[in-house]
Amino acid sequence: MTTNPKPNKALKVKKEAGENAPVLSDDELVSMSVRELNQHLRGLTKEEVTRLKQRRRTLKNRGYAASCRIKRVTQKEELERQRVELQQEVEKLARENSSMRLELDALRSKYEALQTFARTVARGPVTPTKVATTSVITIVKSAELSSTSVPFSAAS
């Protein structure tokens, strides 16, 4: 029987990845520091080191992408909340503006009525035919309002 050196090579056992190192979970791999990772990688083959580093990089990128998605959703919700808040404020200001315009129109009408009345008084003695009924009513109402808010002094 002749011995063939080739069977010796066939008997060699190739090390599988991670065989001489404890298996790391994804959480452990991501959470360990670079120094800890380098200590763990000592003694591993170049392929194992490359595979573990690539796996760590992939897992970290997944984490970054997830946190970015969460941040983007949070910012979107905040912007939507601000948009609704500002829209409500615009509607409130539009109502106030409309109310003030109505008040301004009413005051303008009263002012014009008073100017008309003052012109008729300045032209001469007041006769019932010269003064319009609406002007008298407006003046009487205005006089009632002013007498209740500011006392009239006869000493002037």
From Swiss-Prot:
GO biological process, one term: regulation of DNA-templated transcription
Region called Basic motif, residue ranges: 51-76
Domain bZIP span(s) in chain numbering: 51-114
CDD domains linked to this entry: bZIP_Maf_small
Cross-link (Glycyl lysine isopeptide (Lys-Gly) (interchain with G-Cter in SUMO2)): 130
Matches recorded under Pfam families: bZIP_Maf
Subcellular location: Nucleus
Entries under InterPro entries matching the protein: bZIP, bZIP_Maf, bZIP_sf, TF_DNA-bd_sf, Transcription_factor_Maf_fam
Region (Leucine-zipper): 79-93
Domain of life, per lineage: Eukaryota
Residues spanning the membrane: none
GO molecular function terms attached to this record: DNA binding; DNA-binding transcription factor activity; DNA-binding transcription repressor activity, RNA polymerase II-specific; sequence-specific DNA binding; transcription cis-regulatory region binding
Keyword Transferase: no
Tissue: Highly expressed in heart, skeletal muscle and placenta. Also expressed in erythroid cells.
Annotated keywords: DNA-binding, Isopeptide bond, Nucleus, Phosphoprotein, Repressor, Transcription, Transcription regulation, Ubl conjugation
Residues with Phosphoserine modification: 25
GO cellular component, one term: nucleus
Family (UniProt): Belongs to the bZIP family. Maf subfamily.
Subunit details: Homodimer or heterodimer. It can form high affinity heterodimers with members of the CNC-bZIP family such as NFE2, NFE2L1/NRF1, NFE2L2/NRF2 and NFE2L3/NRF3.
Known role: Since they lack a putative transactivation domain, the small Mafs behave as transcriptional repressors when they dimerize among themselves. However, they act as transcriptional activators by dimerizing with other (usually larger) basic-zipper proteins, such as NFE2, NFE2L1/NRF1, NFE2L2/NRF2 and NFE2L3/NRF3, and recruiting them to specific DNA-binding sites. Small Maf proteins heterodimerize with Fos and may act as competitive repressors of the NF-E2 transcription factor.
Cross-referenced PANTHER family: TRANSCRIPTION FACTOR MAF (PTHR10129), TRANSCRIPTION FACTOR MAFK (PTHR10129:SF26)
Protein name, UniProt field: Transcription factor MafK
